[in-house]
Amino acid sequence: MSSASSKRSVMTLFSNKDDIYCHQVKIVLAEKGVLYENAEVDLQALPEDLMELNPYGTVPTLVDRDLVLFNSRIIMEYLDERFPHPPLMQVYPVSRAKDRLLMLRIEQDWYPTLAKAENGTEKEKTSALKQLKEELLGIAPIFQQMPYFMNEEFGLVDCYVAPLLWKLKHLGVEFTGTGSKAIKAYMERVFTRDSFLQSVGEAAPKNLMDDK
């Protein structure tokens, strides 16, 4: 047990406000109504206690008593099991496996393109945003079939998709033409959820419970 973790009596999330993986975890914490301390991290000057807790020095890092977790997927699945209501993973193993595959594809296919849009040259940014916009419009029927991403209920897959769309919105992407109505309706649904508003600091937490 590290001394850094033993000092913390409240669940703590080391995060950075601009990091998409941290945003995922914040949505889950808000969905679950968990009381936690957010420790904002300057990625250019990592705090010593984070380095002591996480050998990779990455965010998000979650500290829950003696347990230290890093990697957003591991953190989110832990939170979903630790705080079962509301459930964010589907009941049946086949459905869960399909959701995990979707999350993997989003992380591998879309997130690197988003990183180019955020950190690349102007040419790379323009190309990346165009690619993401076209790919999302290309799957627009998926957004139309169900209230949430391939699901009747809000779940972990939405915690991958919603932060991506939020980033695109703030990068100036506007969805127009065929398929845009379904995507914009989805964005409206997820962006107005209490959990999402809390995750971006635009609403106060509600019905919080501590982690004991």
Curated annotation (Swiss-Prot):
- Looking at the record's lineage, which domain of life comes first? Bacteria
- Tell me which SUPFAM superfamilies the record gives: GST C-terminal domain-like, Thioredoxin-like
Which residue range or ranges hold the GST C-terminal domain? 92-212
Please give the CDD domains that the UniProt record associates with this protein: GST_C_SspA, GST_N_SspA
Give any Gene Ontology cellular component.
cytoplasm
Q: What range(s) does the GST N-terminal domain occupy? A: 9-87
PANTHER family (UniProt xref)? GLUTATHIONE S-TRANSFERASE OMEGA, PTHR43968
| Similarity comment | Belongs to the GST superfamily. HSP26 family.
Query: What task does this protein carry out?
Result: Forms an equimolar complex with the RNA polymerase holoenzyme (RNAP) but not with the core enzyme.
Which NCBIfam families does the annotation name?
Answer: PRK09481.1 (NF007016)
Protein name, per record? Stringent starvation protein A homolog
Lineage runs: Bacteria, Pseudomonadati, Pseudomonadota, Gammaproteobacteria, Pasteurellales
Question: Which gene name belongs to this protein?
Answer: sspA
